[in-house]
Amino acid sequence: MGTPRAQHPPPPQLLFLFLLSCPWIQGLPLKEEEALPEPGSETPTVASEALAELLHGALLRKGPEMGYLPGSDPDPTLATPPVGQTIAAPFLPRATEPGTGPLTTAVTPKGGRGAGPTAPELLTPPPGTTAPPLPGPASPGPPLGPEGGEEETTTTIITTTTVTTTVTSPVLCNNNISEGEGHVESPDLGSSTSRTLGLLDCTYSIHVYPGYGIEIQVQMLNLSREEELLVLAGGGSPGLAPRLLANSSMLGEGQVLRSPTNRLLLHFQSPRVPRGAGFRIHYQAYLLSCGFPPQPAHGDVSVTDLHPGGTATFHCDSGYQLQGEETLVCLNGTRPAWSSEPPSCMASCGGTIHNATLGRIVSPEPGGAAGPNLTCRWVIEAAEGRRLHLHFERVSLDEDNDRLMVRSGGSPLSPVIYDSDMDDVPERGLISDAQSLYVELLSETPANPLLLSLRFEAFEEDRCFAPFLAHGNVTTTDPEYRPGALATFSCLPGYALEPPGPPNVIECVDPTEPHWNDTEPACKAMCGGELSEPAGVVLSPDWPQSYSPGQDCVWGLHVQEEKRILLQVEILNVREGDMLTLFDGDGPSARVLAQLRGPQPRRRLLSSGSDLTLQFQAPPGPPNPGLGQGFVLHFKEVPRNDTCPELPPPEWGWRTASHGDLIRGTVLTYQCEPGYELLGSDILTCQWDLSWSAAPPACQKIMTCADPGEITNGHRTTSDAGFPVGSHVQYRCLPGYSLEGAAVLTCYSRDTGTPKWSDRVPKCALKYEPCLNPGVPENGYQTLYKHHYQAGESLRFFCYEGFELIGEVTITCVPGHPSQWTSQPPLCKVTQTTDPSRQLEGGNLALAILLPLGLVIILGSGVYIYYTKLQGKSLFGFSGSHSYSPITVESDFSNPLYEAGDTREYEVSI
C-alpha cells in the first residue's frame, strides 16, 4: 500500500455550507422553510430575518465551482423567488418543476457509490414535501493515486448542494374601487416584484351606489398574446354571478362598455414578464334606468321617466279591461325594476255597463280563462231618455257552434231584435226601443276562431244616432244630428264604398221619430281594381280580416308617363300556396318583377315604367280564416331617374346643393336674405325613396325688432311685447337719475335689412347741477369752451407766449348740489427776468444789428438817386428808351409790310 496522499482542505465555501447544514444552527429558516415561530417562542428578531435574507442571497450567488445535481435549474436566480413569495404551478416551465431536496452533504467512499444508510437518508426529501427522492451523486472520476497504483484507502469528502424550487402562488394585485369616476391602469411593470416573478393575477373591483351602472372606455390597450384581460359585470351579491362583457380579443382602444349593475370586475393575468405597454381604462358611473315597459295587446302605455321614480301608466282600448296594476313605478336598486309585472288588456266575458255613452263589446280570446266553451252576457244601460244604437263592426261566427242574440231591454226575457241563427248581420245596425240592450254570446268548441266586435252609442230620442263608418270618414252638416242633418261618407285609401256609387249621403228625417233615410255604407278592401292616383294603398281582400280562399285579384297601378312607381311592402303574411306576383308593366303579360310567398319582411320595389300590375292568387280550399293574414302595400310615383324632384329656391333667399344632380344623399342648405327669416328646416336630404326629408322652407320678412332690453336705474313701457314694426318703447329713470338719450324708441322697417330701433337705448345717470364756465384767464385761453359742464367733465387752461401759468392746468367738475370745480381757474402772468444787465445786453445787440442795416439802406438809396436823377441813366436797363443808336439792317424783301419788322435793335451793355 502506498503512502497516503495528503488531503487538501475543502474550499471556504464548502465549509461554510457544511456549517449551515449542522443541526446546532437553530432559528435560521432556509428558502423552502416557513419562518414561523414555534408555539411559545418569541417572534424572530430583525437580526434573524436579515440573516435569513443573507443566507438566501448566498444561495443565489453560488458560482460555477459549485456543481449542480442533475435536474436542477441551470439558473437559480430565475427559478428561485425571494423569500416568502410563491409561484403558481400552472405558469412554471417544465425545467423548474420540483425535483430537488434541501441542502445536503454526503460522504462517499472511493467506490463512488453511496454506502450505508447515511447516503439515502440525506438525499431523501423531508416529510411533507412534494419533491421526489433525488438520485445519488454522480460516480467519481478516476482514482486520485498515480497511474497503475494501488487503491487508496483514504476517502474524499464530496459536498453536493442543490437548489429547491417550491410551487408557489402568483403575485396578487387586487384593488377595490368605490369612486364614481377614475382610471384603472395595468400594474407597474418596473417594480422589483414584477421584474423578478413576471407573474400577475390582478382583480380590480369597481362598485358604485345602487341605481347606478358603470361605463368604461378603453383608452389604451397593448397586451401580448399570453396576457388576458376580462371585463365582467355583476357579482358581489348572493345569486348574482358575474357576467362576461368582453375579453382581450373583443376589446379595442376607444371602445365603450356598460355594466347593467353597480359592480364591475376587471381581471388581468400575465403568465410571464409582460412585454406590452399594458392597459388604461377610464370608468364613470351613470344612472341606471328601467326598461321600457311592453305595450299591452289592445292597449297603450305612457311613461313619465325611465329612471328611478318614474311612472308608467297603462290604458286599454274600448271593449277591454285592464288586468293588473294601472300605474307602475321604477324602483331603485342594483338593477332598477318596475314595481310589479306589466298588466294586460283582456276582453271580459259579460258584464254590465252603466250610463253607457260610447264603447265596444269584444269577444274574449279563444282558449283563455273561459275555455273553449263560452257563455257571455252583457247588459248595456244608457241614461234616462236615451236609446242605444248597436253597430256590427266585425262578426265571424261558426254557424254550427256559435250563436249571438240581442234583446231590446235589460233582461233575458226582453224581446229579441237579432238572432244569428235566423237573421243576417244588419248593415245599418240595431236600435233599441228602450234605454237598455241585452247581448248574449254562446260558443261551444267552435271549429273556427271566434271574432266579435260590436260598437254601441247612446243618443237622444229626438235625434238620429251618430253614423259610423269603419275604415272611413263621416262629415255632417249638424254635429247634433237633428232632423234635416246630412252625413257624407268617404273611405280611407285602399278601401271602396260598398255598395259602390251613391248613396254616399244620408239624411236624418221624421222629427216625430228621427231616423236616417238610408243605411250607412261600408268601406271594404276590394279584390282588384284600377288605381291611377299619384299615391295609394293596395290591401288584400276584406282587410283587416283574413281573405277567403279562391281569390284571383288583379290591380293595375298607373302614374304619369314621365314617372315610375315605388312599391313598399309593409305587411305580407299569406297562407302557404298563395302568391302575390308583380308585373313590371301594364297587364300580366309584362315582365315579372317579383313573386312573393308566405311571410315576408318589409321591402321596396321600383318599376321601370309608369305601369305596374299586381296579381294575387289564393287557390280554393277549405276555409281557414286566420287573424292578420293578408297584405298591405303602399305605392307612389317617383321620377324615372335616380334623383329627387327639383325644388325651386325660396323667394327672398337661396339654396346650395352638395351635388350637382339631386341624387340620393344630396343635401340642400337654405338661407334667407337680410331682413328675412327661414320658416322650416334649413337642411333637406334626398332619401332612398327619392323623396325629400322635409317640406321646402320659406323666407318670411322679419317684421319685428329685437328686444332693446331694460336699463339700469330705470324702467320701460312697451306698446307691444312682440316689438312689431311701429311699436314704441318708452324709458323712464328712477328718482335722482336723469335720462341721457332718447326717451322713446320706435321700431321702423327697412327695405334691405331687419327692422331697427329709431335710436340707441338711453342711460340713466345721476342727476347733478352742471358747473358754470369759470371764465378765461387774462392772457390765456381754454379748450372745449362752453357755458355748462356736466359732472365729471374736465377743463384745461393754457397761457400765451411770454406768460406763465399760475395754478392748476386742469380742473374737473365734481358732482354735488351744486356741482363745483376742483379748484379755482389759474392765472397767466408775464414772464420776469432776474438780471437787468441782460436787458441792456439785449438792447445793445438789437442796436448792433439795426444800425448797419440802416446805413446799407441809406447808401443804396443815394446811389439809386444819383444814377437816375443826376446822370439820366437807368441803373438796371428796364426803361423803354435807350441811350444807344439803333443798328439798321436792310431787308432783301421789298414788301413794305415787313420793312418795320426787319429793323432790329441791339443793346450792348458794358
Curated annotation (Swiss-Prot):
InterPro entries: CUB_dom (IPR000859), SEZ6_CSMD_C4BPB_Regulators (IPR051277), Sperma_CUB_dom_sf (IPR035914), Sushi/SCR/CCP_sf (IPR035976), Sushi_SCR_CCP_dom (IPR000436). Glycans are attached at residues 176, 222, 247, 332, 355, 373, 473, 517, 641. It is a single-pass type I membrane protein. Residues 288-347, 462-525, 642-701, 703-766, 769-830 form the Sushi domain. One of its GO terms (cellular component) is neuronal cell body. Residues 28-844 are extracellular. Pfam families: CUB (PF00431), Sushi (PF00084). Residues 173-286, 349-459, 527-638 form the CUB domain. It comes from the Eukaryota. It is found in: Cell membrane; Endoplasmic reticulum membrane. Keywords: Cell membrane, Disulfide bond, Endoplasmic reticulum, Glycoprotein, Membrane, Repeat, Signal, Sushi, Transmembrane, Transmembrane helix. Residues 866-910 are cytoplasmic. Residues 92-152, 170-191 are annotated as: Disordered. May contribute to specialized endoplasmic reticulum functions in neurons. This is Seizure 6-like protein 2. The lineage of its organism: Eukaryota, Metazoa, Chordata, Craniata, Vertebrata. The gene is SEZ6L2.
